[in-house]
Amino acid sequence: MLKLRLKRTGRKRSPSYRLVVMENTARRDGRPIEELGYYSPITKQYKFDVEKIKKWLDFGVKPTETVSSLLRKAEIIS
């Protein structure tokens, strides 16, 4: 089952994340099917490709709880 997930990048104690489409059984830092944006919790910056996210959501891909809250803050989903 495919999911919209966060993939951790960055250094130790300085996390940043990429929003990706991955198989739900894949490792957290495994190879994604597609990258859709990034999120930096320290600087509170994010950038998402809205068209690609909506395309994947239309295909039936489920976001995780954290990704859902980020997409609501970005007003991509309601």
Swiss-Prot record:
Compartment list: Plastid, Chloroplast
UniProt entry tagged with the keyword Transport: no
GO CC terms: chloroplast; mitochondrion; small ribosomal subunit
Principal cellular location given in the protein's record: plastid
Keywords associated with the record: Chloroplast, Plastid, Ribonucleoprotein, Ribosomal protein
One example of a Gene Ontology biological process annotation: mitochondrial translation
Name of the molecule in the record: Small ribosomal subunit protein bS16c
